[in-house]
Amino acid sequence: MKISSKKKNEPKIFVSKPLILDIKKFGHSFYRADLEFWGIDHSGPSYEGRIFINNNKANSKTRMTIKNSYVGSYFIFGHGKCFGDIGHCEIRKDRSPYDLRPSHPLTPAYTYITITDQLLKIGKNTTEFVVTIVPVLASGTLGEDEEDVIKLDKIQIITYNK
C-alpha cells in the first residue's frame, strides 16, 4: 500500500496494493460483493473515506461518479487527541474471554461497503482492483494529525454465492 499527498496540510491519500479477483470466472454466480476494511485506527480526526477503484489519481475534488470509479464512502468518528493520563489510550491485548466489559473505545474498527454493481462493471475489463481512499476531514480537526489519517490493517473483496 502507498500513501501520498499533493498539498501541504492535505491528508495523505491511501492507495492499496492490487486485489486480484477474476469476475468473469464467477459469471453471475454471486448476488452481492462487499469491500471490507479491517483494523481501522480511529484514534485521529473524524473523516469521510471516499473510495475509488482503479483510480489512483482521485483526490478530494474528484467527482463521486461511477465514471470516476467511485464506489462509496465510509465515515469514521475519530477519537481525536487524548487528554488522559499515561496509558489511558492504550488498548489492552490481554483481556480474558470472560471479561464482559465493553471493548476499549479505541479498538480498531471494521466497516464495509456493498459494491456489487460497480464491481461487475469495473471487473469486465480487469482482474486487478486497486483501492484508493481519499480522506475528507470533518470540520474542527485543527491541531490533530491531519496528514496520516488513514491507518488500517487489511482490505478485501468478499462475494456471496447465490
Tell what function each PLM region has.
Residues 1-162:
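Intrinsically disordered, flexible peripheral segments
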